From Swiss-Prot:
Residues binding Mn(2+), per UniProt: 237, 239, 370
Origin species: Rattus norvegicus (Rat)
Localization: Golgi apparatus membrane
Domain remarks: There are two conserved domains in the glycosyltransferase region: the N-terminal domain (domain A, also called GT1 motif), which is probably involved in manganese coordination and substrate binding and the C-terminal domain (domain B, also called Gal/GalNAc-T motif), which is probably involved in catalytic reaction and UDP-Gal binding. The ricin B-type lectin domain binds to GalNAc and contributes to the glycopeptide specificity.
Protein name, as recorded: Polypeptide N-acetylgalactosaminyltransferase 10
Function: Catalyzes the initial reaction in O-linked oligosaccharide biosynthesis, the transfer of an N-acetyl-D-galactosamine residue to a serine or threonine residue on the protein receptor. Has activity toward Muc5Ac and EA2 peptide substrates.
Residues annotated to bind substrate: 185, 214, 238, 342, 373, 378
Amino acid sequence: MRRKEKRLLQAVALALAALVLLPNVGLWALYRERQPDGSPGGSGAAVAPEAIQELHSRQKKTLFLGAEQRLKDWHNKEAIRRDAQRVGNGEQGKPYPMTDAERVDQAYRENGFNIYVSDKISLNRSLPDIRHPNCNSKLYLETLPNTSIIIPFHNEGWSSLLRTVHSVLNRSPPELVAEIVLVDDFSDREHLKKPLEDYMALFPSVRILRTKKREGLIRTRMLGASAATGDVITFLDSHCEANVNWLPPLLDRIARNRKTIVCPMIDVIDHDDFRYETQAGDAMRGAFDWEMYYKRIPIPPELQKADPSDPFESPVMAGGLFAVDRKWFWELGGYDPGLEIWGGEQYEISFKVWMCGGRMEDIPCSRVGHIYRKYVPYKVPAGVSLARNLKRVAEVWMDEYAEYIYQRRPEYRHLSAGDVVAQKKLRGSLNCKSFKWFMTKIAWDLPKFYPPVEPPAAAWGEIRNVGTGLCTDTKHGTLGSPLRLETCIRGRGEAAWNSMQVFTFTWREDIRPGDPQHTKKFCFDAVSHTSPVTLYDCHSMKGNQLWKYRKDKTLYHPVSGSCMDCSESDHRIFMNTCNPSSLTQQWLFEHTNSTVLENFNRN
């Protein structure tokens, strides 16, 4: 009998030990699972070891907040099933089959996208679930804060605005939506007045605010935020479509750390046919170049997660789609009230949150589609300058790094940024860190793609073809059109020295119009061994835009395994099978840097 009692006591002791140890083992396993792949001894550690250590510290702080709360599957399975059965124009995010009559310019004139097509697609259309498969099984905190969803608009199309609202209502748990606040920035279209009021009266959670004069996007957002009652403020644009289970992943991160700003993955809704698809490269970190253009850069190996559906840190947000704890937003001062209309605000809020004690993440399991307009369909008030906004952000937040912007944009030096005393005082009261800290701890991978000091170019000037004596020219081309040969103009006096025949073979191994100090954002691009050479948006990811200028004067294109060639008869420039003895495949740059070229061609 005593032996049985002894065994029973041993079993109880083991059970108690398990109760003590297992939660810690589980948390350790969870912690290990969330570590970046880069090991302390790997190549990434040599890049920015302190930044990686600080990242680990930030992850641990976020991990344990709310760890003991109950979790829940927030998916609306019934709604997902119904959506899967929908058929019709644009359903499942498929392109609308357009006719020539539907492509007319008038369709785009008022909105910057094809409103005729938008009007023919259901307000409740289904979207493809293009999240990572792991998102389907993710659980989030059972108790989440609610949110006020702020949607500013100015002269927005009827169907595109309503589809935005419908998508939010259809794909958001009702208990998480405190309200949807539509903020009208002084629209003058009749359908956005009483007809909109009458329609939105059908939805108790929707209310409309209106400005008394044209305020611009930034102040309109601020008006909506000041009226918000939810625990969290979520900003959307007025031509978006929220995808499946988009909201809980955002609110979960804020519930675990109230000083986290979270951004959904922004998918592309085509402005022509309204097809729904991911952005090129999908999950990438937000960044900028030193002219303050927004850029996207790959997630470095040091930051990649074992589970690609997990949230990841991003230095800079894309713009108007994000969620933030309401009280934290106002502790940060909201948007700088001195910023005019639009532009630069995403940098201001990004720098501010990182430097002043917060963090920012992109959430792969939250996806929202956005129509990228063909062009901006309205004029902003006279005297408003994007440059002024960027100068203001640089003066308040970028410290000595602002000089790199002024070197590239000398016209910014003497531009008035307005009174920034209050903003600098706010920065001081929040005990914000320096911009150098931001660049070394948060955006440490940015200089690899966009160095503050531009490395020397490999070659520049005119590109003259040996066989024809003609020069590469862009004057007849628009973005996406083929390059052409034209009579060389360099020798006709300094007045003829212009960017139409001036190119730079940059340190990125791409070729861009312009001299080394003033290159444009377009690159030589080729897709196959017989394709024309076109100008395309530079992506700095090599691929179709990678070139090698070889000692035999050929411009070799590694992706297609071919060389740039030309035709004297019709002045075409195209790719062809490499033939070093062919004079039409030999090209002379006006200036070359032999050291840089040797480094390029070393392998």
